[in-house]
Amino acid sequence: MRVGVIRFPGSNCDRDVHHVLELAGAEPEYVWWNQRNLDHLDAVVIPGGFSYGDYLRAGAIAAITPVMDAVRELVREEKPVLGICNGAQILAEVGLVPGVFTVNEHPKFNCQWTELRVKTTRTPFTGLFKKDEVIRMPVAHAEGRYYHDNISEVWENDQVVLQFHGENPNGSLDGITGVCDESGLVCAVMPHPERASEEILGSVDGFKFFRGILKFRG
Ligand SMILES: NC(=O)CC[C@H](N)C(=O)O
């Protein structure tokens, strides 16, 4: 299965994601910000980092690059798309997932392990978890506070993917830190599953996000 890993100037989790996709048994390949056609791919991951230095707002400039038009086309073709951290911010900026990720309640970069609850298992990335399972993954961001004007709609549509369990380190509304589109195929998560995918890192909970992509394709 061919999975694209999108690179922007300032991406910094691209190699980690590529590595973990290989461990999961996928055939990952890097894709640059100016690529206009991703038809040959079966799925795409937008990794974390500081695309374009987080100028204006995290994700704002990456959102207007040619590759994001190609991602929209993949979504129309019903192929899975996962955005992690800066990737999640980009997916929110282009409107492929509901709501926004904005400046943390305590407005500084925050890096720590978190406990999370998996709120829906209908996405390709969470299909290997049990609903309401508690997992551990780290967060590392300055602009990760989730907000939506009409949060009840997001809950009612089963679009909440991850919720902080216990401590809510950035002040996200309802502790939400992962959301998906209505189909469930486009998923944006602020915590880093690729940093929780090998025993040596302290958790393997995140690995299921990547194995789930392969399982989804059957
Ligand atoms: N780890 C990351 O992807 C960082 C996300 C983003 N640049 C922020 O600080 O909010």
Swiss-Prot record:
It is found in: Cytoplasm. Keywords: ATP-binding, Cytoplasm, Glutamine amidotransferase, Hydrolase, Ligase, Nucleotide-binding, Purine biosynthesis. Pathway: Purine metabolism; IMP biosynthesis via de novo pathway; 5-amino-1-(5-phospho-D-ribosyl)imidazole from N(2)-formyl-N(1)-(5-phospho-D-ribosyl)glycinamide: step 1/2. GO terms for cellular component: cytoplasm. Pfam families: GATase_5. GO terms for biological process: 'de novo' IMP biosynthetic process. The active site is at residues 85, 192, 194. CDD domains: GATase1_FGAR_AT (cd01740). InterPro entries: Class_I_gatase-like (IPR029062), PRibForGlyAmidine_synth_PurQ (IPR010075). It catalyses: N(2)-formyl-N(1)-(5-phospho-beta-D-ribosyl)glycinamide + L-glutamine + ATP + H2O = 2-formamido-N(1)-(5-O-phospho-beta-D-ribosyl)acetamidine + L-glutamate + ADP + phosphate + H(+); L-glutamine + H2O = L-glutamate + NH4(+). The keyword Transport does not apply. It comes from the Archaea. Its EC number is 6.3.5.3, 3.5.1.2. Residues 2-218 form the Glutamine amidotransferase type-1 domain. GO terms for molecular function: ATP binding; glutaminase activity; phosphoribosylformylglycinamidine synthase activity. Part of the FGAM synthase complex composed of 1 PurL, 1 PurQ and 2 PurS subunits. Part of the phosphoribosylformylglycinamidine synthase complex involved in the purines biosynthetic pathway. Catalyzes the ATP-dependent conversion of formylglycinamide ribonucleotide (FGAR) and glutamine to yield formylglycinamidine ribonucleotide (FGAM) and glutamate. The FGAM synthase complex is composed of three subunits. PurQ produces an ammonia molecule by converting glutamine to glutamate. PurL transfers the ammonia molecule to FGAR to form FGAM in an ATP-dependent manner. This is Phosphoribosylformylglycinamidine synthase subunit PurQ.
